[in-house]
């Protein structure tokens, strides 16, 4: 995983090939494809693993602000890497879309699948899409606002029906 982060300091994700990654990491293409479908899958896996490791550090109780700030810290600590993930021409929609799908699943699991009907799923997807767009803008434009401002915006964007299930 460090190989791709190191390579992105030298060239864009568009220009990095699976061969480049394998050479830098000392792995064969076969090993790479055993774990990842493509380089974009690797980038998202880095985010997902980093976030999940950080979330494990939180206490077992649910704290919306702490969970959001943990997610945002993943981006701020590796801003250059994630900025490229959001902006490189062949990758942004892939990372953005995977980020949305992961966050929708995470939100539904946090609420409890049995409490989420089709209408709530649509509201969650819309809310997640908006929050991901905010994270993307924040990452790409230099993180001018602090993390608490973003968390407050996430709350303001959340539909009341989702708040009732997610924040209580």
Which ranges hold each PLM region?
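Basic/polar phosphate-binding segments, predominantly the helix-turn-helix DNA-binding elements
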Residues: 21-43, 74-87, 93-108, 154-165
């Amino acid at each position: 995983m460090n190989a791709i982060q190191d390579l992105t300091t030298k060239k864009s994700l568009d220009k990095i090939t699976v061969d480049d990654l394998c050479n830098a990491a000392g792995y064969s293409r076969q090993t790479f494809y055993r774990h990842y479908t493509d380089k974009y899958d690797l980038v998202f896996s880095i985010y997902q693993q980093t976030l999940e490791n950080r979330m494990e550090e939180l206490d077992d109780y649910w704290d919306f602000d702490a969970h959001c700030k943990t997610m945002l810290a993943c981006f701020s600590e590796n801003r250059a890497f994630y900025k490229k993930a959001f902006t490189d021409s062949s990758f942004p929609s892939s990372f953005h879309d995977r980020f949305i799908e992961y966050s929708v699943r995470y939100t539904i699991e946090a609420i409890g699948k049995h409490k989420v009907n089709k209408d709530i799923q649509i509201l969650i997807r819309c809310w997640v899409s908006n929050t991901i767009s905010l994270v993307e803008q924040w990452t790409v434009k230099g993180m001018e606002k602090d993390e608490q401002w973003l968390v407050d915006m996430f709350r303001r964007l959340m539909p009341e029906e989702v708040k009732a299930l997610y924040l209580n």
